[in-house]
Curated annotation (Swiss-Prot):
Pfam families: Lactamase_B_2 (PF12706). It comes from the Bacteria. Transmembrane segments: none annotated. Belongs to the UPF0173 family. One of its GO terms (molecular function) is hydrolase activity. This is UPF0173 metal-dependent hydrolase Tmel_0315. The keyword Hydrolase applies. Keywords: Hydrolase.
Length: 223
């Protein structure tokens, strides 16, 4: 299984199926300019903010992908012409043809800006994706004790940029709660407002005995 970081909170996961998480492509200063997306089977959207719902509508149409998100976002996307959606909610677990997926809690917002309107985007979340390995994408979130309830996480994708999400120290505490085999930092240094030192995070995480892999946009990890 290959995990590719595409800047900000965008990840591509390739196994038997290909998953794109939080597809913020256009306008993403961290997206690698020469990167060409492969065919996408599933698009996972953690919440409705523009830097996460991103280019979902266009990409779902281009690839014929199924979008998995919360109920409200799926309804919104259907109104925008997305044909294949699968709505879930926090705590929901579903056995798909690729494996089991759970939507996890996140402490954040989820309003969708549509023109001059802000549309209710349901509850923000994360995803626990069980393939050959278990991948946890936390979404945008503050530190929460719910993370202690996660079990068997092989790879955790955690925001560290502060201001809107956990900072380095809270993300380290999240690692203590989750106890993953590997952690990859995300949602940092896209803009000055979420600047963070990934090497500081790595040093603190590895003192806990957990492997930390810092991926530059466009780089991949095989697990």
């Amino acid at each position: 299984m290959k995990i590719t970081f595409l800047g900000h909170a965008v990840f591509l996961i390739e196994e038997k199926r290909t998953f794109l998480i939080d597809p913020f492509i256009k306008g993403n200063p961290a997206f690698p300019s020469n990167y060409i997306l492969p065919d996408i089977d599933y698009i996972l959207v953690t919440h409705g903010h523009g830097d996460h719902i991103g280019d979902t509508v266009e990409l779902a149409e281009k690839y014929g992908a199924t979008v998995i998100s919360n109920f409200e976002i799926c309804n919104y996307l259907q109104m925008k012409g997305v044909k294949k959606v699968h709505p879930m909610h926090i705590g929901g677990v579903k056995e798909f043809e690729f494996g089991k997926l759970k939507m996890t809690p996140a402490l954040h917002g989820s309003g969708i800006i549509d023109g001059n309107n802000i549309i209710y985007g349901g509850n923000p979340g994360g995803f626990l994706i069980n393939l050959k390995k278990s991948i946890y994408h936390a979404g945008d979130t503050g530190l929460t004790k719910d993370m202690e309830l996660l079990e068997g996480v092989d790879v955790a994708l955690l925001p560290i940029g502060g201001n809107f999400v956990m900072d380095v120290n809270d993300a380290v505490k999240a690692v203590e709660f989750i106890k993953p085999q590997i952690v990859i930092p995300m949602h940092y240094n896209t803009w000055d407002l979420i600047s963070a030192d990934a090497n500081e995070f790595k040093d603190k995480v590895e003192k806990l005995g957990v492997k930390c892999v810092i991926l530059k946009p466009g780089e991949s990890l095989e697990v």
